[in-house]
């Protein structure tokens, strides 16, 4: 039997990068996966890969995670089509790197909305279903930036540190409910995020999205009596 046979997962940011890798990995292990991202075309491509590979069922739901109503609709459609929600992975994220003096308040708002607030809204939206089931696992994808001082990333770091703190508190609030909450803290991952950034670390030294997917898989496949409430994953080459 596959590790996630019979499980239903919602993955945000599933169109590319880390979210895509996690969705593909979960489907390969038998999960039914609700794929959420803004791009309908990217979601269709990922859903097609899942079906071609013969993995679990895939439901592509174009979603703007900064829209509370869209998030509620995502959860409602997933629960309606698959009858339950066992796993939530919040992998949607964005970044704009600059010194605080050179940064733009509009970028602050975008990062706070996508990286922090949207993840909080997603968690709140799935909790009624998970609490009724008395089981579920939430994995919030933060960043090593939540724990390291990286020049040029003050606002990005604030959003990821906020997500880290939120996840730890939520884990305590739900400790005896059957719902587990973990936060995943990857270092530099080779994703399209770096395509437009000058001075990035060598791409071949970074983590791969599939590495992060393996870590997420570990977090959601532990037996019910165990929880990885915090997992840091770094490149072995000494870069962040």
Give residue spans per PLM region:
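C-terminal helical subdomain
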Residues: 176-179, 183-184, 191, 201-240
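Substrate-binding pocket helix/loop in short-chain dehydrogenase/reductase
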Residues: 99-100, 107-112
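Residue(s) in the substrate-gating loop at a strand-loop-helix junction
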Residues: 143
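Conserved glycine-rich Rossmann-like NAD(P)H-binding loop of the short-chain dehydrogenase/reductase
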Residues: 29-45
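Active-site helix of classical SDR
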Residues: 123, 159
């Amino acid at each position: 039997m596959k590790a996630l046979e019979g499980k239903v997962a919602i993955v945000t940011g599933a169109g590319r990068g880390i979210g895509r890798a996690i969705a593909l990995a979960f489907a390969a292990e038998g999960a039914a996966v609700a794929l959420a991202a803004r791009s309908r075309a990217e979601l269709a491509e990922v859903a097609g890969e899942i079906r071609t590979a013969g993995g679990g069922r895939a439901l592509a739901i174009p979603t703007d995670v900064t829209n509370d109503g869209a998030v509620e609709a995502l959860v409602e459609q997933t629960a309606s089509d698959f009858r339950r929600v066992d796993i939530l992975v919040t992998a949607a994220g964005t970044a704009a790197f600059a010194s605080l003096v050179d940064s733009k308040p509009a970028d602050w708002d975008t990062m706070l909305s996508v990286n922090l607030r949207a993840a909080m809204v997603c968690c709140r939206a799935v909790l009624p279903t998970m609490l009724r089931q008395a089981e579920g696992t939430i994995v919030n994808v933060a960043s090593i930036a939540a724990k390291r001082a990286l020049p040029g990333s003050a606002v990005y770091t604030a959003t990821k540190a906020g997500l880290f703190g939120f996840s730890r508190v939520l884990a305590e609030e739900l400790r005896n409910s059957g719902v587990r909450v973990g936060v995943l803290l990857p270092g530099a991952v080779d994703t399209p995020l770096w395509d437009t950034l000058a001075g990035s670390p060598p791409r071949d030294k970074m983590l791969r999205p599939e590495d992060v997917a393996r870590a997420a898989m570990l977090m959601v496949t532990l037996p019910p009596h165990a929880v990885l409430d915090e997992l840091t994953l770094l490149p072995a080459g000494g870069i962040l």
